[in-house]
Amino acid sequence: VRMLVDLGLISGYTDGSFRPAAPVTREEIAKVIARLCTDDPQAENLTAFADTAGSWGNLYVCFCAERGVITGDGQGAFRPKDAVTARELAKMLLVVLGEDGTRYTGSGWGERVDADALRLGIYDGFGGKLDSAVSRDDACLLIYNAMQCPAVVNEKATGMMRYALDDLMNPKTYMETRFGLVRYTGVLEANECADLTTAGGKLAVGMSKLAGHKEFAVSSDLSLLGRTVDIYMLNG
């Protein structure tokens, strides 16, 4: 949740709460998805659906429709106030990642979404029902998982040619290609509190070190020492 807030993808309510168990509407998720795609979502056609015209979320809904992320109910409506299901959100995320959205339409679309979402890890840690309303907390989980997936640049290619690649020819995650963030994972062996590798040692204030990695300009507390943690840094 904190990462998505820091990236400007989500926010809480005016009373300072987040309401993690509350359902997410289709209109609300369209805004999140649009921001996941770009900092400045725009749409050429602002009349994609009759039931969103004039609403606060119309721009985001139309932006997503133009990108093939959402398709409505087939009757010209989007049902913006309905709750979005986990499977519907997964479908949107797959298209954002660059997968061919036409695969997720028609008969059996849900099975194809589930197969791809499971394969990529989008459902990792999710214990709810895929066809039920997804909570705000679980929506954050699915979005976070999707951002760790490879960014597809050519859905018709095979193998590594499908993905954006780094200098070592490894697939870049969507998080890296969109936000420039790279994840480093390892055991936290030293910070400003102590150094597990040197008796009485410690790092400068605001520094942390993972085993097998250089020092990072990131603060961490004593309780994290010796534990496996993730550190996210801007690439370059």
What are these regions (language model features)?
Residues V1, L7-L59, E66-R87, L93-A133, ...:
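Feature responds to low-complexity, polar/acidic, surface-exposed segments characteristic
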Residues R136, L225-G226:
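Short, flexible surface segments
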Residues Y144:
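Conserved redox-cofactor binding core of oxidoreductases
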Residues N235-G236:
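OB-fold/S1-family single-stranded nucleic acid-binding modules
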